[in-house]
């Protein structure tokens, strides 16, 4: 009998909406069972969604130009990957539906019995030439604009990006040092290369533009008219309205625009430097326009997996051309376009030289047979190659029909891979593994002398000299005599050695009521400690009595030449 306290029983009304949801859920689980590949793709999709949320938060919080550019770039890359992963998941689900229902795709093409092996595709030495005007590059005229550019590369659902490069008119081409590697590429791949750019406004370039504009207008229009124009500009700025003749600043960070793109296929693969055409998508009126020449130079290499990984191995008895004996018992390894024959299987693992090698190329002919007079090795596999007018045949003897079938399938798969990858199977192209990318480093800004001064009033002289010594980068001598004018203790003579210096006076100790000294990160002295006391900072060298008066600008020593 049904009891409310009985937790092991659940009743659902027949035909209710809840029952239909349960049935629909069971149908989905049984009909769309996710494969490990789909699970991995879903995990990547979830990761990119979290990365996009983090990039949005970072873009809303960052205040530096470099941070905003990197956050915007990350947001664009994450959005591209999310769209790519969602499209791939949708395609796989549709294929599952067609397979379960027994329907064929719209093109009604029979599925191939053999699918070509995948390979590694690497693009490196990327350079995009620029085409500046003569007045901009040679005569160095006009405003100096800067662009932040990067490349987005895609093969299927795999999307990679390069580091961001700052470009101005001092550069003749855009150079990317990254080696972009795609580990899972098919022979019919299409590598789409997209160049994105954003115009970078210099910080502080427009900060004083309203006041400078008002000053120029007031001086050019005369005293009376200029005063009225200046007053109107000041009132507009004080009322909170946008300054006249100045655009409203953009909200949401910088915007990257698609400047050019191209598509590279297997035909463009070459073990060398090559130039490809670019399709330009921006015009000169675009704020992110960059004077591109219309081409990209790069090295595109490909490594099919059949060329770098063994596809078959096992015990063989090889009878070479011209031999009348039963053959030599070897361990054969099919790798690339060669069948390597070793004495033992351990020799292949340790990388020793093979006993001999049988070449297998596109012109090789393979024929299977059976020998009645060899009961231990009854099955044969003949491999024939032509060298000019001569034909050389090597015969492989195998123990079982299953071994013969495995070697035949491996050879037919190799022939099929060579027909799909074509010239990439002639020789193994060199591909360097990309180095781990370092995080972008923001440009260090040196604080002014005002922000680096100490806060305690009794310690100002020591703080200033300490900062100047840190900027100069040299070890300064003991305190000069003029420092005694600001203290109660007489200055030490110049002949005193460091060992005879008296202990640190009481006034040099940190004050209990004062705020701690604050320095900028680039001017923090390395020898400051966090203990209760600190040593006297090195002071400037002594000066002659003549140098204690007024100085002209040309007589200042290097330790006083500090930007304020």
Swiss-Prot record:
UniProt cross-references to PROSITE patterns, sorted A to Z: REM_1
Tissue specificity of this protein: Abundantly expressed in brain and kidney. Weakly expressed in lung, testis, skeletal muscle, heart and thymus.
Residue numbers spanned by region Disordered: 518-564
Segments forming domain REM-1: 17-98
SMART domains xref list: Hr1, PH
Alphabetized InterPro entries for the sequence: AHD (IPR012966), Cytokinesis/Rho-signaling (IPR051364), HR1_rho-bd (IPR011072), PH_domain (IPR001849)
Source organism: Mus musculus (Mouse)
Protein name as catalogued: Rhotekin
Record has Phosphoprotein as a keyword: yes
GO molecular function, one term: GTP binding
GO biological process, one term: regulation of apoptotic process
Residues the record lists as Omega-N-methylarginine modifications: 14
Phosphoserine found at: 30, 106, 232, 520, 529, 544
Domain of life: Eukaryota
């Amino acid at each position: 009998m049904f009891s409310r306290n009985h937790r092991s029983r659940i009743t659902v009304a027949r035909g209710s909406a809840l029952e239909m949801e349960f049935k629909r859920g069971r149908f989905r689980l049984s009909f769309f069972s996710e494969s490990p590949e789909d699970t991995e793709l879903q995990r990547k999709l979830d990761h990119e969604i979290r990365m996009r949320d983090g990039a949005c938060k970072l873009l809303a919080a960052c205040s530096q130009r470099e941070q905003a550019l990197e956050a915007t770039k990350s947001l664009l890359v994450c959005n591209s990957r999310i769209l790519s992963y969602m499209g791939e998941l949708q395609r796989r689900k549709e294929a599952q539906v067609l397979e379960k229902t027994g329907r064929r795709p719209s093109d009604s093409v029979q599925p191939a019995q053999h699918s070509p092996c995948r390979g590694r595709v690497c693009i490196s030495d990327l350079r995009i030439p620029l085409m500046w005007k003569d007045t901009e590059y040679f005569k160095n005229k006009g405003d100096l604009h800067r662009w932040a550019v990067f490349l987005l590369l895609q093969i299927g659902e795999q999307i990679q990006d390069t580091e961001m490069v700052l470009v101005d008119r001092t550069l003749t081409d855009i150079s990317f040092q990254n080696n972009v590697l795609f580990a899972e590429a098919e022979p019919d791949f299409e590598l789409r290369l997209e160049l994105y750019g954003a115009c970078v406004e210099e910080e502080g370039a427009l900060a004083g533009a309203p006041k400078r504009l008002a000053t120029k207008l007031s001086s050019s229009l005369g005293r009376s008219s200029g005063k009225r124009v200046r007053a109107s500009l000041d009132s507009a700025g004080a009322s909170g309205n946008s300054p006249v003749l100045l655009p409203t600043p953009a909200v949401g960070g910088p915007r990257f625009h698609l400047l050019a793109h191209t598509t590279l296929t297997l035909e463009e693969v070459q073990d060398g430097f090559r130039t490809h055409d670019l399709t330009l998508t921006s015009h000169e009126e675009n704020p992110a326009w960059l004077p591109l020449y219309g081409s990209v130079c790069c090295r595109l290499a490909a490594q099919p997996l059949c060329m770098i990984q063994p596809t078959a191995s096992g015990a063989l008895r090889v009878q070479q051309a011209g031999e009348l004996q039963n053959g030599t018992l070897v361990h054969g390894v099919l790798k690339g376009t060669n069948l390597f024959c070793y004495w033992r299987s351990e020799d292949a693992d340790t990388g020793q030289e093979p006993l001999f090698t049988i070449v297998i190329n596109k012109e090789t002919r393979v024929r299977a047979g059976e020998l009645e007079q060899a009961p231990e090795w009854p099955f044969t596999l003949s491999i024939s190659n032509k060298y000019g007018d001569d034909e050389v045949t090597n015969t492989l003897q195998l123990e079982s029909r299953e071994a013969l079938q495995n070697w035949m399938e491996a050879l037919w798969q190799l022939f099929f891979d060579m027909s799909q990858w074509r010239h990439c199977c002639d020789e193994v192209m060199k591909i360097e593994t990309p180095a781990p990318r370092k995080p972008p480093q923001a440009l260090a800004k040196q604080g002014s002398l005002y922000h680096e001064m100490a806060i305690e009033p009794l310690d100002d002289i020591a703080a200033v000299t300490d900062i100047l010594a840190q900027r100069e980068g040299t070890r300064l001598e003991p305190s000069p005599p003029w420092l005694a004018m600001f203290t109660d203790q007489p200055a030490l003579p110049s002949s005193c050695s460091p060992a005879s210096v008296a202990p640190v006076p009481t006034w040099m100790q940190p004050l209990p009521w004062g705020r701690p000294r604050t320095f900028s990160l680039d001017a923090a002295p390395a020898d400051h400690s966090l203990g209760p006391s600190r040593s006297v900072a090195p002071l400037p060298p002594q000066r002659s009595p003549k140098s204690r008066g007024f100085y002209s600008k040309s007589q200042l020593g290097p330790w006083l030449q500090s930007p304020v």
